[in-house]
Amino acid sequence: MTALDIEEIPGVGPATADRLRDAGYITVESIATATPVDLAEAAELGESTTKKIIKAAREMADIGGFKTGTDILARRQDVLKLKTLVPEIDELFGGGLETQAITELYGEFGSGKSQIAHQLAVNCQLPQELGGLGGSCLYIDTENTFRPERIEQMAEGLELADLPEGYVVPTPDEFLANIHVARAHSSDHQMLLIDAARELSNELTASGLPVKLVIIDSLTSLFRSEYAGRGTLAGRQQKLNRHMHDLFKLVDDLNAVALVTNQVMANPGLLFGDPTKPIGGNIVGHTATYRVYLRKSKAGKRIARLVDSPNLPEGEATFMVETAGIKPC
């Protein structure tokens, strides 16, 4: 299907199109799914103007009506898979982490959440034939856990076979250059970084290395520290809900993978079984497409359990965290 140019939208001339692109709205679909208020603020346009533009974009993109299951299946053909290169984990995900979806990793400290995030920041730059997506990575760091030295170790530790003809594996420095890191200092700043990600993705697409992975490590840390106590819970959940939906719209527009890590807490009311539960409640639970519980095991092993998915059965996979990266047991 041929992509539509935003200048084809009735009422959008070259000047307006430039404003929209600068704000990160580079496709007709991204405009069609925006709200008038968001579009007006981002592109500095009048709200009445943005309402007309959004209406026209929805008509062009055929968004807002019912579609048959066949139509949905056809769109699913655009979904790509990002591999961890650990066969057991990739099988758990049905071939890898999906684009146009949010995958949540939750678990206690040291369970491997940030390690998997670092590994995928490397892997996403590989060509599709080698399990990657041939793109760049945006990494929103809320806990100061991003370590470039770890990226270098993982880049050097890649074990690749059957390289495509003419393909040269990037150097560790080249891998690092394609990971764009932003340190979030507050929940509001974290939410604004999704808007900044739209603008940066526009530039990177033009450079030939589109954004194919967006990582937030961790999703709830800043929200949790700023909104303490039950009296602030409603406000926190409202902001978190908006943040998650903005993230989903971003990766849906970019056909990219969203990976978020999440903290956990103990459920004191549970008398039997594992009392560990993720932060964020139903808001995160309903918005994340895939939820994976990570926990430590014996002899340095880690266990990844897929606990929620719209199309895959529950299951477990084991892996090791080594100097060279995430590896099979």
UniProtKB/Swiss-Prot annotation:
Residues annotated for ATP binding in this entry: 107-114
Q: Which UniProt keywords apply?
A: ATP-binding, DNA damage, DNA recombination, DNA-binding, Nucleotide-binding
Q: What are the coiled-coil residue ranges?
A: none
GO terms for biological process, alphabetical: DNA recombination; DNA repair
**Could you name the domain of life of the organism this protein comes from?**
Archaea
Q: GO molecular function terms here?
A: ATP binding; ATP hydrolysis activity; ATP-dependent DNA damage sensor activity; damaged DNA binding
Q: Which InterPro entries match?
A: AAA+_ATPase, DNA_recomb/repair_Rad51_C, DNA_recomb/repair_RadA, DNA_recomb/repair_RecA-like, DNA_repair_Rad51/TF_NusA_a-hlx, P-loop_NTPase, RecA_ATP-bd, RecA_monomer-monomer_interface
- Please name the PROSITE patterns in this protein's record: RECA_2, RECA_3
Entries under SUPFAM superfamilies matching the protein:
P-loop containing nucleoside triphosphate hydrolases (SSF52540), Rad51 N-terminal domain-like (SSF47794)
Q: Which Pfam family, giving just one, matches this sequence? A: HHH_5
Q: What does this protein do?
A: Involved in DNA repair and in homologous recombination. Binds and assemble on single-stranded DNA to form a nucleoprotein filament. Hydrolyzes ATP in a ssDNA-dependent manner and promotes DNA strand exchange between homologous DNA molecules.
Q: Which family does it belong to?
A: Belongs to the eukaryotic RecA-like protein family.
Q: Which NCBIfam families match?
A: PRK04301.1, recomb_radA
What is the protein named?
Answer: DNA repair and recombination protein RadA
Q: Which organism is it from?
A: Methanocorpusculum labreanum (strain ATCC 43576 / DSM 4855 / Z)
Organism classification: Archaea, Methanobacteriati, Methanobacteriota, Stenosarchaea group, Methanomicrobia
Q: Which gene encodes it?
A: radA
